[in-house]
Design a protein with these regions (language model features):
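Secretory/organelle targeting and membrane-embedding segments
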Residues: 1-215
């Protein structure tokens, strides 16, 4: 029920909230029509109009032909009203990243004062890597947990029909816009227009584990 409530609170996105892309050479793939408008990449901005998330932008992207397969959620924290550091100190926002691919990890990046009398700050990282801390102890395979839940009658991780319908109600109007996909090179991170989409909020995409795959 709670997942359905969240979808019901999602504000309908428009043409200014989405960027479509298509990797170079897509139209030359076997079975692809030369006049195809099918994208291979999408970046989207959404807002959830409820008391908890009002005014907070959610950015998501997915695509094919990118540098690596990465699955992660990154949260950028707002600056507090009263900063501990002087206003002339250039502070980057704090970030928390939850990664599941290519490896399970949690990363926290925050600013800290450098030792000494001056007021200099530097971003530092605190990391947890499942494989490093637990060695060969294997996590359940992708469908192992779902199969076990199905046998036990636990539907918590499954998607209900009304949830699917609500999700498509948000996506269908975007597909009807017939936007032209922007071309991007194979092995990159998508079209430049996706960077412009998120830059409006003074944010940037983190390319795997808080940018480690880009460094």
């Amino acid at each position: 029920d709670e997942k359905v409530k969240v979808l019901q609170a999602v504000r309908q996105a428009g043409a200014d909230d989405i960027v479509l892309g298509r990797y170079e050479g897509y139209l030359q793939e076997d079975g692809v029509a030369t006049d195809s408008r099918t994208p291979s990449y999408a970046a989207l901005r959404l807002y959830i109009d409820n008391w908890r998330w009002q005014g907070v932008p959610f950015y998501m992207r997915s695509g094919k032909g990118l540098t690596a397969k990465v699955t992660e959620i990154t949260m950028q924290f707002k600056h507090v009203p009263h900063l501990l550091f002087p206003e002339n100190v250039d502070l980057m926002p704090n970030h928390l990243s939850l990664c599941s691919q290519p490896e399970e990890a949690i990363h926290l990046r925050f600013a800290t004062k450098l030792p000494g009398a001056g007021m200099r700050v530097k971003p530092v990282d605190m990391d947890f890597h499942y494989a490093q801390d637990f060695g060969d102890t294997a996590l359940p395979a992708a469908y192992e947990r779902l199969l076990l839940d199905a046998m036990q009658g636990d539907a918590a991780l499954f998607t209900r029909g009304d949830e699917i319908e609500l999700a498509w109600e948000l996506i269908d109007p975007l597909t009807e816009l017939e936007l032209t996909p922007h071309t991007y090179p194979v092995g990159g991170w998508g079209p430049e227009q996706a960077d412009d989409l998120i830059a409006v909020e003074n944010c940037s995409w983190h390319c795997g584990c808080l940018g480690r795959l880009q460094e």
